[in-house]
Each structure stands twice: as C-alpha cells, then as structure tokens.
Amino acid sequence: MVVAAAIREEIEIPEGVEVIINNNEVTVKGPNGEDSRKFTYPNVDITEVENNVVLETSFPRKKDKAMIGTTKAHISNMITGVTDGFEYHMKIVFAHFPMTVKVNKDVVVIDNFLGERHPRTAKVVGSAKVVVKGDEVTITGINKEHVGQTMANLEQATKIKGRDPRVFQDGIYLISKE
C-alpha cells in the first residue's frame, strides 16, 4: 500500500478576518467578535502562510488524515462564525397546556410543559444568545458548537418520556439553521 509522504490542506482567510496561531491555539478575530480554540493533536502542524491557514502532517496514518479534516472543519467554522455567525430557529409546539418559555441569564426556563407544576430548564452554553418571540426561539452566536449544544439542550428539556409521541407532540423543535 502506498502512503503519501505528506498531507497539506489550506484554508483561505477572508478580508476583515485576522487569524493568530500560538502553540497550536488558533484565535480568529472578525467583525462579529473573537473565537479561539486549542488543537492538541500532536501530528498536525498549524501555520499561517500568505493569508492562508496551512495544516500539514508528514507520513500520515489514518487518524492523522482524519484529524487534518477535522481541524480544517473546526477552523472553517470559526471563520464562518466571526464573519456571518450561526443562527438556529426553533418552534414552540403545544396542544392543550400553553407553555411559556423565558430566558434567565444562562438558563432557559420552560413553565407549564404538559401541565407540569415544576418548570423545566435548559442551559445556554458559552457565548450563545437565546431570544424568545411568541412561539419562535432564535439561538445565535459565533461558536457553532455552543449554538448547537444550546439547541440540543432545549430539545432534550422538552423530551416526553412514557407517553405516545404520536399523540403528545408538545415540545420545542428545530425548524431551520442559517
């Protein structure tokens, strides 16, 4: 089996975005803010060459090749986050008991879910911001993982156990990603 001597991937840095690389910690600054992340995989070298982020590895194994792709995706998501940001839209669905959703600092409180007396809570992760307008919930942020995990926390908080999901369709569901 022939093995490539090296793998090299490049990510172009757009106008108005600054990338700082310091000991495998990548910091991306852009018009929407700043995001940083430490990449600790030993066989992947991260450098900046002529307005490009370059990821390299020598004599790669399967895991090294996979980590190059993963690291490239993470850095691309960081660049997208500081330029455009991420926005997820969710819909509050209820049939009989009108639930109310409120945001208190870094916790989303769901009252009267299926007529329950105790409120359910969902954690807002990291730099994500949650806005509730009527029956729409909008989650925005520059870090894709924080926005996605906050969305998952909201969905899990309204998960119904022990009842037929075809009948009890109440909850907060994802309707679109931007």
From Swiss-Prot:
GO terms for biological process: cytoplasmic translation. Keywords: Ribonucleoprotein, Ribosomal protein, RNA-binding, rRNA-binding. It comes from the Archaea. Disulfide bonds: none annotated. InterPro entries: Ribosomal_uL6-like, Ribosomal_uL6-like_a/b-dom_sf, Ribosomal_uL6_a/b-dom, Ribosomal_uL6_arc, Ribosomal_uL6_CS2. PROSITE patterns: RIBOSOMAL_L6_2 (PS00700). GO terms for cellular component: cytosolic large ribosomal subunit. GO terms for molecular function: rRNA binding; structural constituent of ribosome. PANTHER family: 60S RIBOSOMAL PROTEIN L9, 60S/50S RIBOSOMAL PROTEIN L6/L9. Belongs to the universal ribosomal protein uL6 family. Part of the 50S ribosomal subunit. This protein binds to the 23S rRNA, and is important in its secondary structure. It is located near the subunit interface in the base of the L7/L12 stalk, and near the tRNA binding site of the peptidyltransferase center. This is Large ribosomal subunit protein uL6. It comes from Methanobrevibacter smithii (strain ATCC 35061 / DSM 861 / OCM 144 / PS). The gene is rpl6.
